[in-house]
Amino acid sequence: MMSKHIFQKEPVLSIATCLAIISAFFVPPDAEYLGYIDFRTLAILFSLMTVMAGLRGQGVFDRLGHALLSHTRTTLQLTAVLVGLCFFSSMLITNDVSLLTFVPFTFVVLNSLNASVRSKLLLPIVCMQTIAANLGSMLTPLGNPQNLYLYGKSGMDMSAFVLLMLPYSIISLVLIAIWAVWLCREGSAIVVTHSAVNSEPDKKLIALYGILFVACLLVVLRVLPYGVAFAAILVCAFFADRPTLGRVDYSLILTFVALFIFIGNLGRIEAFSGWLQNVLAGHEVFVSVLASQVTSNVPAAILLSGFTDNFRALIIGTNLGGLGTLIASMASLISYRQIANEVPAEKGHYFAMFTISNVVFLAILMGAWAMT
């Protein structure tokens, strides 16, 4: 019964752990296992999640949302703010944190509107917030876990990474803008009422996390050793804001560890290694998009990176592959759970809307890739 509960709560971690254990029967544990683990990626991931949890705990992102909403007067402006927050913020705070913050915020804001406007906007906005967070996050190495991993693995510099994904980000932004105008084609004036964030933020903590975020950026840019930033963030959080350490997504870190072990073992099984290298050769984008649909894009990135050096193609493929099925990007489940909890009668409608919208966006972006 407990194992079923764990699987339902953490399906990706559960599957990754099972795969790691099964692979250990074919490649018994030895000293080489330690070499599988990318400690730099894990340290940066922990550091970023801790800093984001700290800033979120201080209501920084909620206050940003409230400030922007104070200028909205129409449904189009409201939609642009709520969806734009997810698109642009995900570039720096990750798609997960963006959705964890702004989807609940959206429920609060829309609840202040009349029932007809709320019912018209709720599902489309949450659906597009999810797509926007996934697509906005693809522009930077900080945007999502697979980017962070592949950026470190590839040895690319920041500018090369951004330039690689910039065309897809621009196309995505244009598509989202067109969608917003279409949704609000019968736009009407609205009055948004929303309660201010109650608790006063700790300005010293916000300043501290701001400094620590800069440290994270310096690590990503390979200016600062990851061990220094990791130690500083761990010590600062432990002594200055200990509850934040409890809000870190440790299951994601453990998922990475399990996948590192699984991929490391597969690489030592010659028959499988040779087969996958042949499948990938020249088809990295297409294969990574397909793999993301069934495993989600983080496991797909880690799996495929062990069998090709074409990291540019993997970066494109796993980012575009975050579109499509509900599990293509695990961040998408955050929004789905919010819908299922808040308006359970609408979750089927949301799922259909989400799937159709994702397939359309994926088809257009894959078409753009095919023309490059």
Language model segments and positions:
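Membrane-interfacial loop-to-helix junctions in multi-pass transporters
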Residues: 39-41, 70-83, 113-125, 203-207, ...
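Interfacial loop-to-helix junctions that mark the boundaries of transmembrane helices
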Residues: 3-9, 31-41, 156-168, 198-203, ...
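Flexible interhelical linker loops that connect adjacent transmembrane helices
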Residues: 2, 66, 183-210, 239-246
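Transmembrane helical segments that form the transport core of multi-pass membrane transport proteins
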Residues: 36, 58, 62-65, 211-309
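Cytoplasmic-side transmembrane-helix entry/capping segments in multi-pass membrane proteins
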Residues: 9-14, 39-40, 66-79, 121-131, ...
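Membrane-core helix-loop-helix motifs of multi-pass transport proteins
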Residues: 117-184, 190-194, 336-365
